[in-house]
Amino acid sequence: MQGLFKKGAQLFLGLTLGVFYPLIFQALAQQTESLIYEIGAQFQLEGHIISTEVHGNGNVNDTFLLFCEDEDSLNRYTLQRINHEVFKDPEGLMNNFSRVTRHLQAKIEEERSSKECLRVVSARDGRAFHRDSDGNFWRVTRFVDGGRSYDVPENDRQAYEAAKAYGEFQAKLSDMPGEPLLDTIPDFHNTRMRFENFRTAVERDEAGRSSEVGDLVEFALEREFLADKIKAEDFPVRVVHNDTKLNNVLLHKSTGEGMCVVDLDTVMPGCALHDFGDLVRTAACASVEDEVDLDKVRFLPETYGSIVEGYMESAGDMLDSREVGHLALAPLVITYELGLRFLTDYLEGDVYFKVKRPGHNLDRVRAQFKLLVSMEESLEEMEDIVLRFSATKSLA
């Protein structure tokens, strides 16, 4: 009798949740859409908002598309909530953002180029952002038409175009006037600091997970030497992107050319090698960064060659011999660094990166460390590729 009652209760609960869960999610979606309409109305948009949708799969900010109707035209905008838990000074960040985009736009106009850059849409009070009643910071940029992003390149030309676009981005910003940009995340690519944070996370074991990942901890400890291979203070300080994943470059849908670099929150003073290395990490790999089938994770030397070619074509004249001399090692360092960050976040209870499933950060760690091993096996070939493409450049 008791078992029958238990089964009946489970059935009732299942039916109840089956009925009400869709209603709950529908109510939450309607509440979110209402908020997005309200926030969007705080900006100087052309036309009135007729629809919105969630956009992208970023790990930090929340992003939405706004569709605005203005007489006979349809205008699209990108609305983002700046994660002020990650970016502690959103106003300073938006000052960086505005300065960088104005400078890039001026360069594009001066060169009469067909390239694009993000353009900030001011709030109704004239600022580059809106702060809502809950203390959240929001910004709007014009949607860039005609471009497409890729998590993994479909061919080596896409990797070449992305590398060329990032090199042009660095080169265009090399003469930006004014005070240095704000460090939106201090020590963002301080690999030594990332290692020490990882070691502390292992020792504290706040989430009780370290016993599950002993092999990964050992792997990271064995490669501590990588933490000191590229120190920012040993290289020229440049205005760099700091998050140069392949999908942060829009490639033209028709021509395939790199047309716009996006996701500018971490643009700040830094080392060009970190930008180069992070692009290689995402573009010269046969899989996405959270691939669960590790047999698919491998480094692609041929694609690396295309990246070196594109980057040297646009940024080679800017780089000095020390930077070029570390182009082979940079991808290993940045891959190790990101693996450390994912592992640290897992040990701390998944508090920084967005996770979409149990063990998501762990999947990311395993994929990055597998990629690192593949890079280590290809290091000599990478060095030969750099020598081949740098031979024609006059280095400072």
Locations of regions flagged by a protein language model:
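Active-site activation/catalytic loop segments of kinase-like enzymes and analogous catalytic loops
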Residues: 273-317, 333-352
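ATP-dependent phospho-/nucleotidyl transfer catalytic cores
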Residues: 87-91, 147-160, 175-241, 246, ...
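Active-site acidic catalytic loop and adjacent metal/ATP-binding pocket
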Residues: 59-68, 74-79, 120, 224-274, ...
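Juxta-kinase regulatory segment immediately upstream of eukaryotic protein kinase catalytic domains
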Residues: 25-48
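Protein kinase glycine-rich loop
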Residues: 54-57
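Cationic, low-complexity basic patches in intrinsically disordered or flexible, solvent-exposed regions
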Residues: 11
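Conserved ATP-binding subdomain of kinase catalytic cores across diverse folds
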Residues: 62, 67-69, 74-77, 82-193
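ATP/Mg2+ or Mg2+-diphosphate-binding catalytic cores
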Residues: 337-396
